[in-house]
């Protein structure tokens, strides 16, 4: 995915929630982004923006701050979701909850992608885990997200 060196990246994943695996995923995503696009600036959506900023050297907005999320997406050149198991519907899926803190799964992350596309932003999906998808709504919403992405990579064969 070609992008200018001055790019502004927005990353969204399960960051800032105290899960070491997700923090390592963000650290590796940042290392790759900074190597590919030296000089890029990175902003993250996070459960704990202060912690995410301190740990990773990025700016961050709370994932529950809808106006802040809109500003972050609007300011980005590229919106990256991932990695990790963001697309599952263990607790159901509600398309009416797009971008809502009531849903931290498919509905929330699909909302980030929908907002990005409404604002004509590029979308990439990086090292995502997909599934289980137990509901037709979960499968349809996940497929819609993947159709909107310019680039998509999953973390394992089970996610294909």
Where in this protein do the model-derived segments appear?
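Alpha-helix/helix-capping structural signal
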Residues: 15, 157-158
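A conserved, positively charged/aromatic
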Residues: 140-149
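Aromatic- and Gly/Pro-rich donor/ligand-binding loops
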Residues: 1-134
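Distinct, well-ordered alpha-helical segments
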Residues: 134-140
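A short beta-strand/loop micro-motif in the catalytic core of glycosyltransferases
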Residues: 149-156
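Alpha-helix capping/helix-boundary segments
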Residues: 86, 158-159
């Amino acid at each position: 995915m070609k992008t200018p060196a001055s790019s502004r990246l927005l990353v969204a994943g399960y960051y800032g929630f105290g899960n070491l695996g997700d923090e390592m995923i963000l650290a590796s995503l940042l290392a790759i982004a900074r190597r590919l696009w030296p000089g890029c600036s990175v902003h993250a959506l996070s459960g704990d923006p202060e912690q995410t900023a301190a740990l990773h050297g990025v700016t961050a907005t709370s994932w529950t701050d809808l106006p802040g999320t809109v500003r972050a997406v609007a300011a980005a050149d590229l919106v990256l979701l991932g990695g990790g198991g963001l697309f599952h519907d263990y607790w159901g899926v509600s398309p009416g909850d797009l971008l809502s803190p009531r849903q931290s799964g498919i509905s929330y992350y699909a909302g980030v992608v929908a907002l990005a596309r409404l604002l004509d932003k590029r979308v990439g999906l990086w090292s995502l885990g997909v599934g289980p998808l137990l509901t037709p709504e979960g499968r349809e919403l996940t497929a819609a997200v993947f159709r909107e992405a310019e680039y998509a990579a999953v973390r394992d064969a089970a996610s294909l």
